[in-house]
Each structure stands twice: as C-alpha cells, then as structure tokens.
C-alpha cells in the first residue's frame, strides 16, 4: 500500500514574492529572549524547605520522594509520600517511588524538558501517563521554574478541555508528574486519518478555543500550541490542551521571562519580543490550517514568512469551505491587533450552533441516563410488587387447600342381575375393593366383576404386569402349603356373593375378606388342580 505523505509548500523562485526584511528592520529585530532564572521561589510550604537551597540539601533528603502541591499552600509541615502495600514490599529493593508504584509500559513522547511514559499503577491496575524531567535540578531557581508547571496543571486540571492532573513528586533531583492517559495526540490522529472531515475540524476548534479561553481569562498565555500538545480523550471526541511548561503571565512575559515554542507555529511578533494572547490565536490558526489541508509546515525560510504575512497557498486553501477559510485567515493575520480573541471566535455562528447542539445532546444524554435509572428503579419496584403479590396468592391458595373439608370415600355397590334372561333370580352385587399386599404395588383398583366373567380368578395371564418396585421372593414350601392356603381363601370367600345369604348388602361387604395376592403377582408358580368331590 502506497504511503501518503503531507505535501510540502511550493517553492517561490521570484524575489518579489520573498518577504525579506530590510536593513532598518534587521537593526530593530531582536533575537527570541532566552529563559532567564526567576527572582522568586515558587515552592509549596507543605512539601519543600525554603530555608535550604538545592546544593545544601543532604543526599538522604534528595533520595526521599516528596509530594509537590500548591493546593494546600497554608500547610507548613513537610511530608513525604504515603507508602502503599506494594511499595512496602518493594522498599527493600532500593527502588525509586516511581518504580515501586508504577509499571512502565511504553514511551509516549519526548520533549525538551522531559519524557512521557505510559504506566500501570501497581495498586489499582489503572493506566496513567507520567512525565519525568530529563535534566537534574541545577539549582533552586531552576527547580522553582520546573515546579511552576505543577502549579499550572493544578490550576487548569478541572477544565473539560485541559488535561486532568493527578499528583506530582520529586526524588533524586527529578520531577515526576502523574496525569490522565489520553488516547492519542492530534498529530497522531492526523497521520492516522490523513483526511479529517471538516465537521470534525470545527469540533476540534471549538474544544481548543474553550480551553484557550480558560487560560486567557486568567491573563495567561500558552506559547506552545501545536498538534503534539493537543490530546484526544478516552471518549475519542474531546480534545484537551496539554504541556503547560511554557505557560506564563502576560505581564511577566514581556519582561523577558518567556520562551518561545515550536518555530513552525510561532507568531511573527514573537521574534520582536512581543508576547500577547494573540500569539496563541495565531498558533491555533496555523494548527487548524495544517489539520484541514494536511500540509507540512515549514520551520523557517521564505515559505515560513509567506504564512506570517497572510498569504496562504491556493492549492491547499481551496480544499476547505469558504467559512473555514475566513476563520483561519482571521486568526493568522500579521497584525496581532486585528486577530479575534478566543471569546470573539466562540461567538461565530458556526461555533454557536455547535455549542447549542452539544448542549442539547448533553441534556438529552442526561435525560436518557436519568430515565434509564428511573426505569430500573420502577422496574425493580414492580418486580418486588409482583413477588409480594405472588407470595400472597400462594399463601391464600394454601389456606384454601387446608380449609377444604375431607370426605371419606364409600364403596360403590351396584346391584346387577346375574343373568339377563333369568327371572326371579336374586341379584348379585358388584363390589369395588382394592388389593393390598406386602409387595409395594402402584395403587390399582380391582373390581369383583373382573372375576365374574367365567375366568379363573387365579389366572393372571391376562391381567397385565403391575409396576412392582421390588422382586417377589420364591416359594420354598414345596407348593403344598401355598395350595392349601389358596384353596382355603377361595372356599372361604366363594366366587359369588349372594344377597339373600345376608340380611343386608352391607353385611355382605363386612363379611368379605381382603384377598392377599402379593405372593403370586410376578408369575404363576404352579397350576391348580381340583379333585372331583
């Protein structure tokens, strides 16, 4: 697959198109001021000892990890970082606080002052980004300058479009800053996507203007706005400003205490030593030009001056809409006084529309979340009501079942004639009884009429096999006692029961005996032979 590269700016061969500075301008041109040491020490009373300089600090104190924070400046007690259980286990290995608390996974980036690593917290397993200063503290003033970045991170950490800062500490004359881990930088996003939709560019511009306005409202300037210093959050939508190492107050910046950022994004007035909020607007405008046109910005040369004089290459600028062209050109005007402020840009109709759209979507998302929560609550209550109602119903049915009267079953006696053709013959009652035996058999009701059809009552070949739970023991009495027993039972009961032999049908039932057939349920053990009497 062919790799796409960003197109360079066209070379200009005609001298009349070159924007050279005349000798008079060169005489008044100043070199960019270098970063000078500051006359104050911005040190927190809670963590640092103001009475000692870095050179006079003992070696043991520099090896101890001290927390850095400007949020509780009123505290005067110096404290060290608390030890976690994992840190306590690794403390015997003479590891730094960073190595004890974090597992280094990858290197995310590198700047002029430090390196950024992706780490995993050993205590909770969460992923973070930790920035470690490259150089050792060369003195108290240099240390105070590095700690100023911690103050700025803590100041803007709560803003939606600024990176979230967690904590900072110093150990072994180095500064460590723990921050949230974002998905990627805007530079990486551009290299991955190459062509970014214009609607997405408008959203990115809105995020960065909101973050930049939070700095300008405090009379601070960033001075290092570029695609590498813009990070995309975990939601893959929100863009956040990062790297506040060059952030400085506007009043102090013009007294030669400021340092310029990347020359590709630098405003032209920075070369003259004039620092203002408009410099951040220019840097943001040229960053949007790079993002929208996918072009490679020059770091110096005549093309660099072309962009600083408001001349944009037509072959690049024609690829975007006129509305976006107008905004970018207004942000890149050579005169800082003619550039719009962050607040004025946020009042642009397109950006106003996006803000209203975001607000409506935010309200809708909040409403949907609250609806889902309320729906879960209502459904939970309904389920509780259903469960309670079902329990009450079961209890009611159980009470009804217990209150139902129990009626004893009476035997059914049907008087039928013994022979349909005969007249005057006594009727024979049909008696319903149940066979009970020692062998467990499924409840089976037998009727006397089953044995009144002329068949042998002891012939069980046509009766079907009952469901026997256990086996029947074999007869070991040589068959004689069993035969006598059966004959006695048959003789005592008789094959027919006549009504006239008793005073009433009930007396006939009372005289009937229960037939025990448990001994011949499984198979016929022998054949009955009656002697002729």
Curated annotation (Swiss-Prot):
Residue span(s) of domain Protein kinase: 102-351
EC numbers on record: 2.7.11.1
Residues that bear Phosphoserine: 504, 519
List of residues binding ATP: 108-116, 131
GO molecular function terms attached to this record: ATP binding; metal ion binding; protein kinase activity; protein serine kinase activity; protein serine/threonine kinase activity; protein serine/threonine/tyrosine kinase activity
Gene3D superfamilies: Phosphorylase Kinase, domain 1, Transferase(Phosphotransferase) domain 1
Domain of life assignment: Eukaryota
GO BP term (any one): male meiotic nuclear division
Region (Disordered): 1-35
Annotated localization: Golgi apparatus membrane
Keyword set, alphabetical order: ATP-binding, Cell cycle, Golgi apparatus, Kinase, Magnesium, Membrane, Metal-binding, Nucleotide-binding, Phosphoprotein, Serine/threonine-protein kinase, Transferase
Binding site for Mg(2+): 229, 243
Listed GO CC annotations: cytoplasm; Golgi apparatus; Golgi membrane; nucleus
Topology in membrane: Peripheral membrane protein
Reactions catalysed according to its record: L-seryl-[protein] + ATP = O-phospho-L-seryl-[protein] + ADP + H(+); L-threonyl-[protein] + ATP = O-phospho-L-threonyl-[protein] + ADP + H(+)
Record: active site: 224 (proton acceptor)
PANTHER family assigned to the protein according to its UniProt record, in alphabetical order: EUKARYOTIC TRANSLATION INITIATION FACTOR 2-ALPHA KINASE EIF2-ALPHA KINASE -RELATED, MEMBRANE-ASSOCIATED TYROSINE- AND THREONINE-SPECIFIC CDC2-INHIBITORY KINASE
Role of this protein: Acts as a negative regulator of entry into mitosis (G2 to M transition) by phosphorylation of Cdk1 specifically when Cdk1 is complexed to cyclins. Mediates phosphorylation of Cdk1 predominantly on 'Thr-14'. Also involved in Golgi fragmentation. May be involved in phosphorylation of Cdk1 on 'Tyr-15' to a lesser degree, however tyrosine kinase activity is unclear and may be indirect. May be a downstream target of Notch signaling pathway during eye development.
Family to which this protein belongs: Belongs to the protein kinase superfamily. Ser/Thr protein kinase family. WEE1 subfamily.
Official protein name in the record: Membrane-associated tyrosine- and threonine-specific cdc2-inhibitory kinase
């Amino acid at each position: 697959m062919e790799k796409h590269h960003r197109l360079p700016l066209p070379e200009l061969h005609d001298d009349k198109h070159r924007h050279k500075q005349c000798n008079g301008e060169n005489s008044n041109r100043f070199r960019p001021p270098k970063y000078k040491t500051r006359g104050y020490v911005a040190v927190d009373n809670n963590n640092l000892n103001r009475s000692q300089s870095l050179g006079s600090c003992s070696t043991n104190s520099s090896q101890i990890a001290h927390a850095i924070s400007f949020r509780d400046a009123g505290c005067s007690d110096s404290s060290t970082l608390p030890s976690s259980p994992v840190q306590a286990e690794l403390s015997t290995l003479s590891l730094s606080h960073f190595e004890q608390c974090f597992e280094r996974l990858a290197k995310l980036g590198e700047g002029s002052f430090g390196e950024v690593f992706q780490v995993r917290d050993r205590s909770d397993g969460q992923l973070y980004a930790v920035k470690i200063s490259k150089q050792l503290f060369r003195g108290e003033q240099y240390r105070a300058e590095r700690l100023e970045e911690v103050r700025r991170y803590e100041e803007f950490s709560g803003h939606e479009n600024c990176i979230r800062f967690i904590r900072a500490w110093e150990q072994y004359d180095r500064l460590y800053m723990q921050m949230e881990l974002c998905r990627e930088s805007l530079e990486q996003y551009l290299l991955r996507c190459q062509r970014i939709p214009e609607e997405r560019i408008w959203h990115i511009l809105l995020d960065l203007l909101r973050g930049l306005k939070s700095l300008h409202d405090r009379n601070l300037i960033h001075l290092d706005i570029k695609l590498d210093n813009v990070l995309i959050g975990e939601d893959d939508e929100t863009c956040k400003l990062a790297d506040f190492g060059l952030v400085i107050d506007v009043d102090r910046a013009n007294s030669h205490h400021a340092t310029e950022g990347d020359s590709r994004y630098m405003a032209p007035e920075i070369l003259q030593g004039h620092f203002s909020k408009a410099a951040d607007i220019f840097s943001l405008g040229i960053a949007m030009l790079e993002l929208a046109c996918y072009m490679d910005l020059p770091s110096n040369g005549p093309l660099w001056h072309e962009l600083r004089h408001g001349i944009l290459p037509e072959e690049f600028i024609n690829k975007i809409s006129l509305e976006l062209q107008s905004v970018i050109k207004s942000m890149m005007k050579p005169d800082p006084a003619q550039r719009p402020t962050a607040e004025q840009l946020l009042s642009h109709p397109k950006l106003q529309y996006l803000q209203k759209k975001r607000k409506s979507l935010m309200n809708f998302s909040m409403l949907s979340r609250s609806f889902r929560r309320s729906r879960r609550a209502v459904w939970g209550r309904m389920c509780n009501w259903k469960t309670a109602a079902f329990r009450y119903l079961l209890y009611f049915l159980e009470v009804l079942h217990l209150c139902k009267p129990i009626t004893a079953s009476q035997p059914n006696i049907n008087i039928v004639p013994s022979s349909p053709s005969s007249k005057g013959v006594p009727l024979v009652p049909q008696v319903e009884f149940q066979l009970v035996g020692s062998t467990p058999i499924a409840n089976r009701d037998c009727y006397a009429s089953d044995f009144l059809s002329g068949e042998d009552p002891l012939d069980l070949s046509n009766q079907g096999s009952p469901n026997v739970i256990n086996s029947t023991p074999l007869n070991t009495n040589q068959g004689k006692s069993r035969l006598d027993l059966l004959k006695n039972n048959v003789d005592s009961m008789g094959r027919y029961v006549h009504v006239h032999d008793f005073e009433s049908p009930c007396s006939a039932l009372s005289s009937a005996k229960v037939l025990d057939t448990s001994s011949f349920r499984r198979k016929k053990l022998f054949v009955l032979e009656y002697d002729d009497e």
